[in-house]
């Protein structure tokens, strides 16, 4: 049984993230979506909210499990005896950072592979940062996120005044 981990902040989970989960879940026996605590990034949604949102969107995949983690990805990967780390590459600008991270992960976890997946064409330009910016400025992000995520965004923005 091969377990893979798809780590990220998922702030918020977008249609691009779900696209990668859908495709990666077909490649592995078990896919764990690791929602990173990422306090240093000062996320828009709390860790608990991001877990709830991720479970709402991804809960119908039978071999996908959503779980939070903090600290080193290496420790999370070891705890789950995962063999693969899944990462998304939207553009060349993502590649340099992801290449460095893959190299460090290979050093720390020599028996674990990093698999890069590119999003489907319609999702190549979507990022959580862009979605948050559009939403907080009053724009429509419904084409980039699932209805439940759109609702979460609108409620959070309204609560912040």
UniProtKB/Swiss-Prot annotation:
Source domain of life: Bacteria
Binding-site positions, substrate: 9, 41, 73, 87
Record carries keyword Signal? no
Q: What broad class describes the main subcellular location of this protein?
A: cytoplasm
Record SUPFAM superfamilies: Nucleotidylyl transferase
Q: Does the keyword Acetylation apply?
A: no
Q: Which GO terms describe its molecular function?
A: ATP binding; pantetheine-phosphate adenylyltransferase activity
Say which family it is in: Belongs to the bacterial CoaD family.
Give the protein's function: Reversibly transfers an adenylyl group from ATP to 4'-phosphopantetheine, yielding dephospho-CoA (dPCoA) and pyrophosphate.
Entry's NCBIfam families? coaD_prev_kdtB, cyt_tran_rel
Q: What is this protein called?
A: Phosphopantetheine adenylyltransferase
Traced from the root, the source organism's taxonomic lineage reads:
Bacteria, Pseudomonadati, Pseudomonadota, Betaproteobacteria, Burkholderiales
Tell me the gene name. Answer: coaD
